[in-house]
Amino acid sequence: MFGKGGMGNLMKQAQQMQDKMAKVQEEIARMEVTGEAGAGLVKVTMTGSHSVRKVDIDPSLLEDDKEMLEDLIAAACNDAARRVEENQKDKMAEVTGGMQLPPGMKMPF
């Protein structure tokens, strides 16, 4: 089934991929992205592990409707989370060489 050294090479490749994935996971956890809403009036900075680091609200919004401000904050958080997911997907694609995973399966396993 496997040629000479085939199984050993396969195991070596798997270990290398696992090492690369560990490095990428560390990089993802350290990265920060900023989501925006209201044309940049509300900005949310989030880490790769989805922790909100900072919320920046333009002072002009503090005079407006509380409900609108709450909606903008939620939208900015959702935008930041979407950006984190996109970055994670891109970083993992670098490691897997674009290998497609079955729907619903996330890396790491």
From Swiss-Prot:
One GO MF term on file is: DNA binding
Q: Which InterPro entries match?
A: YbaB-like_sf (IPR036894), YbaB/EbfC (IPR004401)
Keywords for the protein's UniProt record, in alphabetical order: Cytoplasm, DNA-binding
Q: Name one GO cellular component term.
A: bacterial nucleoid
Q: Where in the cell is it found?
A: Cytoplasm, Nucleoid
Question: Which family is this protein grouped under?
Answer: Belongs to the YbaB/EbfC family.
Name recorded for this polypeptide = Nucleoid-associated protein Swoo_1794
Record organism? Shewanella woodyi (strain ATCC 51908 / MS32)
Q: What is the lineage of its organism?
A: Bacteria, Pseudomonadati, Pseudomonadota, Gammaproteobacteria, Alteromonadales
